Regions:
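Alpha/beta enzyme core
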Residues: 1-161, 165-177
Length: 177
């Protein structure tokens, strides 16, 4: 089972809005909200997002779920079924009651997390990745800045990363191409 577990965006955004409201109530004019995302390495979610219409934030979040399409006759007692764009789908649910994301969706989820956090009250975004990869980080920053050109972004320069080894590997990979 994957280690990191996310929650739907609306749950996280409610916390950002609560902090912003607390600043207003307390008269704090220079408070800074830092949103942190390390969803890139998360493969599971705690719950399915509430969605009201196609394309809303909940729908976008649920589109990352690992699902199987099924017919009504194939439904089992206790199944969780989603009507996704007119099709019935069953998200992959683990015995722990967590839901699994599709492989390869981490970067898209992280970019969506980042953009929605900044659009909903975060002043600064702290991005984490599973390893220091310049191309990956740069690509994510560019995608965020396409939507929010003045986004204030910081990166987790973790000493737990073996920076030298990772950069050597990236140079080697570039030479091999």
């Amino acid at each position: 089972q994957d280690g990191k577990v996310t929650v739907p965006h609306e749950d996280f955004l409610a916390k950002i809005r609560a902090v912003r409201y607390a600043f207003l109530e307390l008269g704090i004019e220079d408070g800074v909200i830092v949103a942190r995302t390390d969803s890139l390495g998360a493969g599971l979610t705690k719950q399915i997002a509430v969605t009201h219409e196609v394309g809303d934030l909940g729908d976008q979040y649920n589109s990352f779920l690992d699902v199987e399409e099924l017919e009504p006759a194939d439904m089992n007692h206790g199944d969780v079924i989603i009507n996704h764009h007119g099709k019935l789908v069953r998200p992959k649910r683990l015995p722990s009651n967590l839901y699994q994301f599709r492989k390869g969706t981490g970067e898209d989820r992280c970019v969506l997390d980042s953009i929605t956090s900044l659009q909903n009250g975060a002043d600064l975004l702290w991005i984490e990745t599973e390893k220091p990869h310049i191309g990956q980080i740069g690509g994510m920053v560019n995608r965020i800045r396409e939507v929010i050109p003045n986004a204030k972004l910081v990166y987790n320069n973790s000493p737990s990363f073996n920076w030298t080894l990772n950069f050597r590997q990236q140079v080697f990979d570039a030479w091999s191409e």
